[in-house]
Amino acid sequence: MSADVHKKNKGVRLAVGFFDGVHLGHRRILAGADAVLTFRNHPLSILDPTRAPALLMDVEERISMLRTVGTKKPRNVHAVEFTKRFASMAPEDFVSYLRSEFPDLEKVHCGGNWRFGANGAGTPQTLRDFGFSVKVSRYAKCGDEAISSTRIRAALAEGDVELANSMLGRRFSVSGCAVHGKGVGCKLGAPTLNFEVSAPLRLGVYVVDTPYGRGVANYGTAPTMGESAWQAPVLEVHLIDGCNFDEEDPDSPLKVEFLRFLRPEKRFSDTDSLCRQIAADVKAARSAG
């Protein structure tokens, strides 16, 4: 969204941050804000690409949630590309950028660990030193530890979907358009919808929900018998009560919500063993809350 929209606003209360996942901690920062400044790409994708994390949501989903979560009046979201220019900005230059883009800025909302400028030299106190009013939100906790995007990614990587969902305040989900597979599932009586998605998930089998009902999903390369069906991890969703998805809307993105991890992905020696495991997975999915 153009920054010109913000220039027409009076008394802008601006939330700043990357907000990957828009988790419960982020929502504390967003509370009371009527505008958001965020980056489209993760700063580490420029600063140190080898350390850039797998993201919890794509940029358009993040912008949509930042606009609407916890507010009756949609927020203006100013999403910009993080570039080498931003990476090398002195803190005072970033302050000038804020004043230029948001001349009617009343207050900045941020988390306690938010940093800006080259080498993260700018802090919330830096903004105060330049005359800004700053609201620093306290960490939200889950258990004895602070909620963070990093902690959520770690939970998902371990298969602890329930913990991740608790910190997100919603079910972790991915969205994508179905792609054609090799038809193995159909031959076994368990047809799947296949999605090429990048997610910080442990490889394995999950209980999921979709707009078409409950499902069992395998995230991995599908090493059923012999060679893997996919070179990179793919999400294969079997809808346990059936659905002719092709007749519904085959080109429409499908949202898949994760309820819990069932088991690691594994290779089977024969078709009968695989079919028995599919039946057990379906039974577990039906009994899941």
Question: What do these predicted ranges mean?
Answer:
Residues 3-60, 64:
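N-terminal catalytic cores of NTP/NDP-binding nucleotidyl/phosphoryl-transfer enzymes
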Residues 182-289:
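Phosphate/ribose-recognition catalytic cores of enzymes acting on nucleotide-derived substrates
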Residues 23, 66, 108, 164, ...:
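Residue-level signal for inorganic ion chemistry
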Residues 44-132:
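N-terminal Rossmann-like or analogous alpha/beta NTP/dinucleotide-binding catalytic cores
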